[in-house]
Amino acid sequence: MGLTSQLLPPLFFLLACAGNFAHGHNCHIALREIIETLNSLTEQKTLCTKLTITDILAASKNTTEKETFCRAATVLRQFYSHHEKDTRCLGATAQQFHRHKQLIRFLKRLDRNLWGLAGLNSCPVKEANQSTLEDFLERLKTIMREKYSKCSS
């Protein structure tokens, strides 16, 4: 069952309108989800949140906002890819194991949303200062809250 040529123009028009509508609301929706994810992440105290991560936020003075989001997503992806099965993070109890799996799930969600805001395919990340994941997420949450307040006004 193929689409007739009469249906194609209205479908493309609807897709274009939906894309413009979503882009206008992207600021509020994406930022709200990022902030909620960051709130959940910073409340969690797991073995992995004390591990170090490349702190691209400390050296982001001469970068655009999109580059900062892209680099944050990149270092988060490197972190959770490296530590997903790390025995130091998995813990000895079932509760620690569950918290770790939840942490990884939240980091993946945050990564996906930051990539969406960045809109870039890739970005280089140079080795910089290190900080704990916990501190990195707190600083990222502050940045996102500031952006959300600008977006809302």
Curated annotation (Swiss-Prot):
Residues 1-24 form the signal peptide. The keyword Signal applies. SMART domains: IL4_13 (SM00190). GO terms for molecular function: cytokine activity; growth factor activity; interleukin-4 receptor binding. It is found in: Secreted. GO terms for cellular component: extracellular space. GO terms for biological process: B cell activation; immune response; interleukin-4-mediated signaling pathway; negative regulation of inflammatory response; positive regulation of DNA-templated transcription; positive regulation of macroautophagy; regulation of immune response. It comes from the Eukaryota. Keywords: B-cell activation, Cytokine, Disulfide bond, Glycoprotein, Growth factor, Secreted, Signal. Glycans are attached at N62, N129. Pfam families: IL4. Disulfide bonds join C27-C151, C48-C89, C70-C123. PANTHER family: INTERLEUKIN-4. Belongs to the IL-4/IL-13 family. Participates in at least several B-cell activation processes as well as of other cell types. It is a costimulator of DNA-synthesis. It induces the expression of class II MHC molecules on resting B-cells. It enhances both secretion and cell surface expression of IgE and IgG1. It also regulates the expression of the low affinity Fc receptor for IgE (CD23) on both lymphocytes and monocytes. Positively regulates IL31RA expression in macrophages. Stimulates autophagy in dendritic cells by interfering with mTORC1 signaling and through the induction of RUFY4. This is Interleukin-4. It comes from Macaca mulatta. The gene is IL4.
